[in-house]
Amino acid sequence: MVVREFKIIGGNMKFLITGGAGFIGSNYCHYVVNKYPEDQFVCLDALTYAGNYNNIKELEEKDNFKFVKGDITDRELVDKLFEDEKFDVVINFAAESHVDNSIKNPGIFLTTNIIGTQVLMDASLKHGVKRYHQVSTDEVYGDLPLDRPDLLFTEDTPIHTSSPYSSSKAGADLLVGAYYRTFGLPVTISRCSNNYGPYQFPEKLIPVIFSKAMRDEKVPVYGTGENVRDWIHVHDHNVGVDLIVRNGKVGEVYNLGGHSERTNLTVVKTILKQLGKSEDLIEFVEDRKGHDLRYAIDSSKAEKELGWNRTYNFEDGIKETIDWYLEHQDWVEDILSGEYKEAYKG
């Protein structure tokens, strides 16, 4: 195996960012397009229900950004894009990511998250990409017991998935590792905890709480609400991804966590309090099938090797996030009404 080891130092590089109109990907686009004006960035997104062109529309005014509508599973489209653009780096944010949807319809998760990853890596090999980065999730590790707060996920924690979603992401991670070992594709993988911040599609916990509470509707909470998640602000996550892409060791996995564990019920109560809404809006509903108990990440590898650190604590980050939603209620309304689907005219 010959691996094309390459450290990115910036300057006149061309990046493909897949899934760049989604929540995490669009925040990443805003971060890198403004931070690295000397580099070129192409965003590829299929604009499925969770992809919103409005998230990145203003970036098209920048000289170093271009949007392309397309699906990562479309082998012909992807190959032509690689041929035309001659990418140096590929960062794959594109994914079906809602656990509940994966329980109802696993097939699309396998297609997008595994086959789509294969299509991107085949093109990366064919066209000599210098670095392929896979954005993954801590859910591939399964869950941790609630009564063992000392336990954390490390990069050596075995994969032990609970849902079709996490299984599809784990399958993609294993395939990425296989392409590194078998074909010498220079890869890195990041696994993050639960993200929050601006532009999050209102199907995930925090924007669901906001949109329901603002309408004085019942806020659904699975089970007893005691399941624990580690929360990381999307900006901190994306800074970590950028450091891994540019300085991470080829073939390695890096965990990125927020060190901010909260029960789901605590998160709900925190947001209701900030909005001045009554806890009477909370409605406990039947628990999710196979609901993971607790996620908690050890990020010491990224901290020590790459100098990565979080800048947001949960209290400040959630306040800033809710303030953003309050200031951008038209964005929320466009999504809830479906009007956002008409934003892209290309």
Task: Set out the residue ranges of the language-model regions.
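C-terminal substrate-binding subdomain of Rossmann-fold SDR/epimerase-dehydratase oxidoreductases
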Residues: 35, 41, 51, 70, ...
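Generic recognition of short, well-ordered alpha-helical segments
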Residues: 27, 54, 80, 101-104, ...
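Short glycine-/small-residue-rich flexible loop motifs, especially phosphate/cofactor-binding loops
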Residues: 79, 121, 177, 209, ...
